[in-house]
A protein has these predicted regions:
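Active-site-adjacent structural segments surrounding the nucleophilic cysteine of cysteine proteases
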Residues: 1-74
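Conserved active-site-adjacent core of cysteine acyl-enzyme catalytic domains
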Residues: 48-186
Length: 187
């Protein structure tokens, strides 16, 4: 996976989790669809060039980064349109208010729909709850979802590590919500 520590600018390294996750979703999708070759996809220098391009569209705001899923959705949509890439952006917001929060099953279905198309999901976690594998106020790509007994778990890439967290526990415990975003090829 890509790493926001690759950015050369201090502000980008500090607040670049959103553009980094968006770059991974985009880069993987382009590779899968034959629009990026393996050498280009796996080269860190070229990946950083894509991260800097994505930064111009999925731009962190001072005081909080890309802390709204709508900003990820709008930025990716603009980038795809500007570059003539035939993809749709899908977004699911998780409200900070329990009464208006989507059900765990709906979030799991959204993630499943993306992964079934062989595309990672950018995940915004504004508050980690009790999930030790997550950092608060952070975007990470989800690359898999699996069951562990009755628990729905999501595999993530972050800081060069592979970790997993409980989707149900996160949705129950988060006090600030978050959301999910992926792209799919237009038909």
């Amino acid at each position: 996976g890509y790493d926001q520590e690759w950015f050369t600018d201090e502000w980008q390294r500090l607040s670049g989790c959103g553009p980094t996750s968006a770059s991974q979703v985009l880069g993987y999708s382009l590779f899968r669809d034959g629009l990026l070759d393996l050498e280009t996809t796996s080269d860190q220098t070229l990946a950083l060039e894509r991260m800097n391009l994505v930064w111009k569209y999925v731009k962190p705001r001072f005081g909080g980064g890309v802390y709204k899923t709508q900003w990820m959705e709008r930025g990716l949509t603009r980038l795809l349109e500007d570059k003539g890439l035939s993809y749709d952006v899908h977004m699911l917001n998780v409200s900070p208010f329990c009464a208006s929060r989507v059900e765990v099953e709906a979030a799991a279905q959204f993630i499943h729909d993306a992964l079934a198309q062989d595309v990672p999901v950018a995940f915004l976690n504004r508050h980690k709850g009790k999930e030790k594998a997550l950092y608060t106020w952070h975007w990470v790509p989800i690359h898999k979802m699996f069951m562990d007994g009755d628990d729905i778990r999501c595999g993530i890439f972050d800081e060069g590590e592979i970790r997993d967290f409980s989707l149900a526990n996160w949705m129950k415990d988060t006090i600030l919500g978050g959301g999910f975003c992926y792209i799919s090829r237009k038909e």
